[in-house]
Curated annotation (Swiss-Prot):
Residues 242-270, 269-299 form the 4Fe-4S ferredoxin-type domain. This is Putative electron transport protein YccM. Residues 55-91, 182-195, 333-357 are periplasmic. Keywords: 4Fe-4S, Cell inner membrane, Cell membrane, Electron transport, Iron, Iron-sulfur, Membrane, Metal-binding, Repeat, Transmembrane, Transmembrane helix, Transport. The chain crosses the membrane at residues 37-54, 92-114, 159-181, 196-218, 310-332. It is found in: Cell inner membrane.
Length: 357
């Protein structure tokens, strides 16, 4: 009687029960969460500093002055998109909110190379959404999964929002964008954004509350269905050379990769993950118990040869390196801060609630 052949597989080095300990330097999830917390802390600092800067002008200089944080430009994606159109047409950096455009370009480059890594490694909204989802999972023991007939149309909403903003940017001539960026509204655009959060109306409060509650039950509700920024990164990420790739020969069909994927991608059924929903978070890679089976790489992993694959520490180095390189360029070029005279800020910021488009 012929002896049945058993599939032999090699356990991923350092794993216990198929997982690496959280404090193992090879654990990609630990590197990602550390990067997320760093960016979240930076954005909290930016928000607090910006609030103090605005209050200085609102109180007629009676409070402590702090310099305007240039990082607030990262919260002006529409200005960044419009300025990107202006720069592509004219070949020049915009005079106001150039940093918003450069940060947008940095995040596009990250998505172009590393899938939607901006969403899962850098975005503070994505981090908060993930934390809320984790809380919901601990409180209720599970996450809701919407049926396909509802999930697919809802995922299309963020692309409709993205199309609207791209249409606005494409519709405006470069000269019109230039004049708009010099307008009083553009100068205090960041202050208007702060006012939106400081003085929420009833409808906005209800919407935010519903979204927060939904995020407890539906993982990444905002990111999956409504975020136009993530939609843009997803479209760009289709060109990414790095993808999650699976070696079907060594795969033991345990299904852990698909079960743990926060985007609910059936990784265990695919040879390479092309979908716009993949954020490059590497959760599936960390869930795989078999060596050389699931990688975030340029080519399919193989048991008999080493393919170049991205590790957690290298992903951290790349996403932070690209972002800080662009910030460094903005500082070197003198556009990290918009060249707005202090007297103009002194006059416009107290009037910001009354300034329209």
């Amino acid at each position: 009687m012929a002896e049945n052949k058993r599939t032999r597989w090699q356990r991923r080095p350092g794993t216990t029960g198929g997982k690496l300990p959280w404090n193992d330097w090879r654990n990609a999830t630990t590197w990602r969460k550390a990067t997320q917390l760093l960016l979240l802390a930076m954005n909290i600092y930016i928000a607090i500093t910006f609030w103090y800067w605005v209050r200085y002008y609102e109180t007629a200089s009676s409070t402590t002055f702090v310099a305007r944080p240039g990082g607030i430009e990262g919260w002006l994606p529409i200005a960044g998109l419009m300025n990107l159109k202006y720069s592509l047409v004219t070949g020049q950096l915009p005079s106001v909110h150039a940093a918003a455009m450069l940060l947008l370009v940095a995040f596009i480059v990250i998505s172009l190379l590393l899938k939607k890594a901006f969403c899962s490694w850098l975005c503070p909204v994505g981090t908060l959404s993930e934390l809320i989802g984790d809380l919901g999972n601990k409180l209720f023991g599970r996450q809701c999964v919407l049926p396909r007939w509802l999930d697919i149309p809802l995922r299309g909403v963020k692309y409709l929002l993205l199309s609207f903003f791209i249409y606005i940017a494409l519709l405006m001539p470069a000269q019109a964008i230039h004049y708009f960026m010099l307008s009083p509204y553009s100068v205090v655009m960041d202050v208007k954004m702060l006012d939106f959060f400081r003085h929420m109306g009833t409808a906005t409060l209800i919407s935010v509350t519903v979204l927060l509650i939904a995020s407890l039950f539906i993982r990444h509700a905002w990111c999956r269905y409504l975020c136009p920024y993530g939609a843009l990164m997803g479209v760009v990420s289709l060109l990414s050379p790095f993808k999650i790739r699976r070696n079907a020969e060594s795969c033991i069909d345990c299904g852990k990769c698909a079960k743990n994927c926060p985007s609910r991608i059936p990784v265990d059924k695919l040879i390479q993950v092309r979908t716009v929903e993949c954020t490059g978070c590497m959760t599936c890679v960390e869930s795989c118990p078999v060596a050389s089976t699931l990688t975030f790489s340029l080519q399919k992993p193989a048991a008999n040869k080493k393919a170049f694959a991205l590790s957690g520490w290298l992903m951290t180095l790349l996403v932070l390196g690209i972002m800080f390189a662009v910030i460094g360029y903005a500082m070197y070029a003198g556009v990290w801060q918009s060249p707005v005279p202090e007297e103009l800020y002194r006059r416009l910021i107290p009037q910001a609630p009354m300034i329209g488009h």
